[in-house]
């Protein structure tokens, strides 16, 4: 059979259209495809919830690909090994409570497991605003990342979600939108974004879990976005806190969706 270029185009357009239409209303929208966002999405999808993940870049994975300074190994502490085990990601003991994993294997497996669990992943999509009702986030306003990068005047599309997770890391992209458009209303000490502090790995890892919480009705922060929002330090290339943060935010949202 001779391949037909138009049939190839139709197949891609039809399937993407089906996926997009099916995910205009979801239980949870995850913004950011790094480790915390992927773990959260995976846990939620495995529990039977409808989850869509939006990543502004072409590739999924956040900063995990490069390990530290492009040395593509990561460190995970013992308390988070159960997440690696559940996802079938290999690791090796380096020293007491320090385990290493191949960064490429880790993030590619996280992505694969999330997709296989039923998470709808949309890459190259930017969240430019939130959809709001009185005192609550109820969805996202989306556009293509290249549209934003080119500075084109193109109106966005909106989608609805019962809960939104900002897992955009240092940038805290969704929280910044809320802080700008609904000022003084964040559940931080100042009502504003407190800002990320300089590196302190031990403190950062514990605060990552503490700061994984609802920052505005309907909007949760996870991973480094939590520390950047609530004023915690950065942790470097140790990822146990990221994995556990994704697990925690999923558990809290699942409890509220019951």
UniProtKB/Swiss-Prot annotation:
Residues binding glycine: 234
EC nos: 2.4.2.59
Top-rank taxon: Bacteria
PANTHER family in the record: THIAMINE THIAZOLE SYNTHASE (PTHR43422:SF3)
Protein name: Thiamine thiazole synthase
List of residues binding Fe cation: 155, 170
Subunit structure comment from the entry: Homooctamer; tetramer of dimers.
Function statement: Involved in the biosynthesis of the thiazole moiety of thiamine. Catalyzes the conversion of NAD and glycine to adenosine diphosphate 5-(2-hydroxyethyl)-4-methylthiazole-2-carboxylate (ADT), an adenylated thiazole intermediate, using free sulfide as a source of sulfur.
InterPro entries reported in the protein's UniProt record: FAD/NAD-bd_sf (IPR036188), Thi4_fam (IPR002922), Thi4_prok (IPR022828)
Alphabetical keyword list: Iron, Metal-binding, NAD, Thiamine biosynthesis, Transferase
Listed cofactors: Fe(2+)
GO molecular function: iron ion binding; pentosyltransferase activity
Family per record: Belongs to the THI4 family.
Pathway note: Cofactor biosynthesis; thiamine diphosphate biosynthesis
Residues binding NAD(+): 36, 55-56, 63, 127, 153-155, 224
Catalytic activity: hydrogen sulfide + glycine + NAD(+) = ADP-5-ethyl-4-methylthiazole-2-carboxylate + nicotinamide + 3 H2O + H(+)
Organism, as annotated: Desulfosudis oleivorans (strain DSM 6200 / JCM 39069 / Hxd3) (Desulfococcus oleovorans)
Gene from which the chain derives: thi4
Biological processes per GO annotation: thiamine biosynthetic process; thiamine diphosphate biosynthetic process; thiazole biosynthetic process
